[in-house]
């Protein structure tokens, strides 16, 4: 078994390994979706690593590189082990192998997310010294099941496309800092995939949202504090 970077590994090889590693996962990605995910999350193959059994990938960690809260950061875009290699500690070996390379690249912190019910992964990360800093809720619903009940009076407003980064006040709308994949840096890596809309009352920005029409993913939605939050949010 040899651990090395994914710099010389083609996408199709990576996609096959990803598909096998996550075959029993809640969400399945096709090739186009995986490519889009890697782009958005800042995947860097030179700082991503895999354990190879001959020519076959046995386990891997795909790292995104960027900044988070002002600190150069590596983000675990995906760690997976093929079923026949599970229980061998490969994920831990890959992580330990990667750390000197990440430090030399100037990375100051490592960030990851894990499903809470994936207790095996949680245990691995805790044993590596990771601590939980916050928890996310994830909501998903089919478009056909979303109903506008019309019980909220509409506002006198205008809705138009915006560039959120040009509004210095937007971060003051937030109740929390967006996650890595929903940050402006990540959105900017795939800017053509997103639409940003602002809700204006008397030409003042009262709320905004950033979403990906192809997937229905709402990356950010926030309203100005002390505004009529429910109605502005609903307009978004």
Regions inferred by a protein language model and the residue ranges of each:
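Conserved beta-strand-loop-alpha-helix junction that forms the acyl-donor binding cleft
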Residues: 82, 111-121, 140-142
């Amino acid at each position: 078994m040899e651990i090395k970077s994914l710099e010389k590994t083609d996408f199709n090889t990576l996609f096959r390994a990803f598909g096998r590693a996550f075959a029993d996962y809640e969400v399945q990605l096709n090739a186009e979706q995986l490519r889009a995910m890697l782009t958005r999350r800042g995947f860097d193959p030179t700082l991503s690593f895999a354990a190879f059994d001959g020519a076959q990938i046995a386990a891997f960690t795909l790292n995104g590189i960027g900044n988070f809260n002002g600190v150069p950061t590596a983000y675990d875009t995906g760690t997976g082990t093929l079923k026949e290699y599970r229980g061998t500690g490969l994920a831990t070996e890959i992580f330990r192998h990667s750390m000197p390379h990440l430090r030399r690249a100037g990375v100051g912190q490592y960030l990851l997310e894990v499903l809470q019910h994936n207790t095996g992964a949680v245990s691995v990360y805790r044993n590596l010294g990771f601590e939980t800093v916050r928890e996310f809720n994830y909501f998903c619903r089919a478009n056909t099941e979303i109903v506008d009940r019309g019980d909220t009076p509409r506002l006198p407003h205008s809705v138009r496309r915006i560039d959120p980064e040009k509004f210095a006040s937007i971060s003051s709308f937030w109740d929390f800092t967006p996650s890595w994949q929903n940050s402006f840096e990540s959105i900017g890596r795939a800017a053509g995939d997103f639409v940003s809309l602002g809700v204006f009352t008397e030409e003042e920005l009262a709320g905004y949202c950033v979403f990906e029409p192809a997937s229905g993913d709402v990356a950010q939605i926030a309203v100005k504090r002390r505004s009529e939050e429910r109605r502005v949010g609903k307009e978004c």
